Amino acid sequence: MARTTVRLTFRGDARNDPIIYRLGQDYKVVTNIRRADVGNDTGWVELDLDGEPAEVDRALEYCRSRSIGVDKLEHP
C-alpha cells in the first residue's frame, strides 16, 4: 500500500459536499487529514491517501470530476 499526500482545493458548493467521506466509502483508500482551512467561499485540505496507486488515482479523478483542485505534495 502506498501513501499519496495531496492538497484538495474547494470552491463554491463543492466545499459543502462530503468529499472525504466519499473517498473512504467509494474507493479503497484510507484518508488522514493533515491540515485544513475552510472559509465561506473556498477551502483546502492536505490529505494523506493510503491505498493501491490505481485506486488512489481513481479517487483523485473523482475529485477532479467534482471541480476540486488536486495537487500532489511531497511527503514531509
Language-model-detected regions and their locations in the chain:
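Long, contiguous binding/interaction regions
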Residues: 1-76
